[in-house]
Amino acid sequence: MSKRPADIIISTPGSKVRRRLNFDSPYSSRAAVPTVRVTKRQSWTNRPINRKPRWYRMYRSPDVPKGCEGPCKVQSFESRHDVVHIGKVMCISDVTRGIGLTHRVGKRFCVKSIYILGKIWMDENIKTKNHTNSVMFFLVRDRRPVDKPQDFGEVFNMFDNEPSTATVKNMHRDRYQVLRKWHATVTGGQYASKEQALVRRFFRVNNYVVYNQQEAGKYENHTENALMLYMACTHASNPVYATLKIRIYFYDSVSN
C-alpha cells in the first residue's frame, strides 16, 4: 500500500474537502480511483509468515511435493463394483507412461491427493428387504507389489469374517499400510428405507509410486507403493453396488 495516497479527505464538522497532492501531474483532471479499504482483521489474517506462530511454518504443506516438479497431473478411474461380503479390490495408481497431462514421464511420481466421489446403492429386489448394510472402504498403500493384488481376506484379519473388524494381518503389517478408512450405510425396507448413500472424500496422501521399465499402467508393473482401494459390505447375503469416480492428482519426480 502506498505511503502517500492520491487523495486525502479532510473532515470537519461542517464540511468535507478533498485535496489532491499531485498538482503538477498531467493526469490531474482524471477521476479519483477508489482505494480498497483494508480492515485490521484482514491485515492480521494476511500477515507475513514470519509474524505467524511456528506451527504455521512447521505443518504447512508445500504446493509441489518434495523431489517433484509441476505441472499437476490428473488421472481418473470410473467404475462400477458389485461389493460383496468377501471384499473387492482395485488399484488406483495405474498411470501409463506418456507426455500428456494424464501420463507419467518416467518411473517415479508422487500422488499428492485423491478425490473419491460416487454412491453406493441397492437394486430393486434387495431394497425391499428389511436390513442395514454398510460398506467399509480402506485406502491402502502396498509397499511391495508383486504379480497381482491380494484379496480382502488375504490382507485383513477379521473376527467371524466381519469386515467391520478388519485389521491388517501381522504378517503383512510391513507391506500394507492403511492410509484412510471410512464407511457408508444403506438401509432397506418398506418404511425407513435409504436405498443409496453418497460417497465423497478428499485425502492428501503424498504417496511416492515407483514403476518398472514397462509403459503400461498396471498393478504388476509397480515396484513400490501401489495405492489400493479395498471395499467390503457388512451384510453376508445382500450385496451392494458402488458407482465411483476416483481422481488422483500427481506430480512427476525430478529424478526420472
From Swiss-Prot:
Protein name per its UniProtKB record: Capsid protein
Transmembrane stretches, start-end: none
Motif (Nuclear localization signal): 40-54
Record-linked Pfam families: Gemini_coat (PF00844)
Zinc finger (unnamed): 68-85
Subcellular localization: Virion; Host nucleus
Motif (Bipartite nuclear localization signal): 3-20, 200-247
Motif (Nuclear export signal): 101-122
InterPro entries: Gem_coat_AR1, GV_A/BR1_coat, Viral_coat
Binding partners and assembly: Homomultimer. Binds to single-stranded and double-stranded viral DNA. Interacts (via nuclear localization signals) with host importin alpha-1a.
The entry's keywords: Capsid protein, DNA-binding, Host nucleus, Host-virus interaction, Metal-binding, T=1 icosahedral capsid protein, Viral penetration into host nucleus, Virion, Virus entry into host cell, Zinc, Zinc-finger
One term under GO cellular component: T=1 icosahedral viral capsid
BP GO terms, sorted: symbiont entry into host cell; viral penetration into host nucleus
Function: Encapsidates the viral DNA into characteristic twinned ('geminate') particles. Binds the genomic viral ssDNA and shuttles it into and out of the cell nucleus. The CP of bipartite geminiviruses is not required for cell-to-cell or systemic movement.
Gene Ontology terms, MF aspect: DNA binding; structural molecule activity; zinc ion binding
